[in-house]
Amino acid sequence: MLKQMIEFLINCWPSLILTALAAYLLGSLNSAIIVTKLFSHSDIRDSGSGNAGATNVLRSQGKLPALFTTVGDLGKSMAAVFIGGLLVSGLNSSYTGGSMKFVLVGKFLAGLFCIIGHLYPLYFGFRGGKGVLTTLGMMLILDWRVALICLAVFTAMGLIFKMVSLGSICAGITLPILTGIFGRLVDGNSAATVLFCIAMTTAIALILIFKHIPNIKRIIKGTESKIGSKK
C-alpha cells in the first residue's frame, strides 16, 4: 500500500495540486462575511467576537443570516470533497482505476484545503472563521457516522456547559479517534488507509484547536461567552 501511494503521488501530483487549489479557492468564499455584507452591508469581523463564523453571525445579525451562513459553510466543504474525488479519479483514471483509496486521498486533500481557505480566505484578507461547520460538511461526505457522532458531542458539550467553543473543541478531539475506530474496527480497512485518514483528521483537529486557543484561555479564566450571551 505504501509503495502504491508513493507511486500515486509521483504520477498524479498535478491533479492533486489542482484539487488543493480548487478547494482552497472554494473555501475562501467565507459565508459569514458574504451573508453579513448582503444583509447589513457590514463586516462580521467588526462585530461581536470578530470571528467570521455562524455563531457570531447568530449573535450579531440574527437567525436568518446565521442559517444562510450555516448552509453556505456546510455546502462548500461538501462540494469541495465531491469535486476533489472527481478530479483525482477523472484525471487519473488510467492509473487509479477508480480505486477508492486513491479517490479518498483527493477527497481528504480537498476537504483540508477547503478548511484552510475558510480560515485564511484569499478574497477577504486571509481573515476567516474557525472551520467547525466546514469540517462537519467535509465529514458528512467522507463518513456520515463520524460526522453525526461529532455533532452529538458538540451539541451535548455545548448544552451542558453553555459554550459553543467547548463543544467545538471536544468534537475536534473526538474526530480522529472516531475515524480510527470506524475505519479499522467497523469497516476493516487496511492499516495504511486508516493511518492516512487518522493523520488527516488529526491535522484538522489540531487546526481547530489552534484556532480556538483564545477561547481555551477564556474558558480557563471563566470569561468565555456562553450560549444566550450577546458578546
Features from the language model and the residues they span:
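Interfacial segments of multi-pass membrane proteins
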Residues: 58-62, 84-88, 113, 131-161, ...
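Hydrophobic alpha-helical transmembrane segments
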Residues: 13, 17-21, 67, 104-112, ...
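Short, strongly hydrophobic alpha-helical membrane anchors
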Residues: 1-14
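Transmembrane alpha-helix interface/packing and boundary motifs in multi-pass membrane proteins
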Residues: 22-28, 33, 115-125, 157-165
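Multi-pass membrane catalytic core of lipid/isoprenoid biosynthesis enzymes
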Residues: 59-86
